[in-house]
Amino acid sequence: YQFYNMDDKDKYVYKSIYAGCARAVDFLAGLDFVDPDRIGVTGGSQGGALSITTAALNPKVKCLAAFYPALADLTGYLYGRGGGWPHTFRNGYMATKERIETTYYYDVVNFARKISVPVFYSYGFNDMTCCPTSTTTVYNVIPDVEKHLWIVPETEHWTYPEQMAARSNWLMDQL
């Protein structure tokens, strides 16, 4: 699914996914039992990417916690470095002009530049799914907001229970 309609930036599957996440926050904020001033987003991998894009697109999001976000530095392989999941251009045959241009619109790095809320961020150096070069790039472009970074060098595409507990405690403090 991650390559569905990738030849057209206006029809690419992530257009509706990103928009759907932003609209979901509006829906939640409208519920009687939800305090619209206490909405945060969190996730890992694709969920980390969606947390970042959602926080960038919807000002109702008050904080963001992300683990090893996917969909970051997607064209990295074209420039001799690792790219993030889904590794679109790892083998080169997918690298058409249209697909490359489409990724510029959906790369999480571009959304991270728009973050204006506190951030909890964690990843490891051994992740082969969302390589550390791509996840570091995302973190480095997040503007000067309150940021909490926890690098756990030995981890791969997973987290320790202590990371999850720290994230949960941080979210509770923020919200």
Model-found features: residue ranges?
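Acidic catalytic loop of the alpha/beta-hydrolase fold
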Residues: 125-130, 157-158
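Active-site nucleophile elbow and catalytic-triad environment of alpha/beta-hydrolase enzymes
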Residues: 96-111
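Cap/lid segment of the alpha/beta-hydrolase catalytic domain
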Residues: 1-19, 76-84
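Alpha/beta-hydrolase-fold catalytic nucleophile elbow
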Residues: 42, 67-68, 152-153
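Short beta-strand/loop motif that positions the catalytic acidic residue
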Residues: 115, 121-123
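Hydrolase active-site cap/lid region
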Residues: 50-96, 159-162
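Alpha/beta-hydrolase fold nucleophile elbow
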Residues: 33-45
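C-terminal catalytic histidine-bearing segment of alpha/beta-hydrolase fold enzymes
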Residues: 136-175
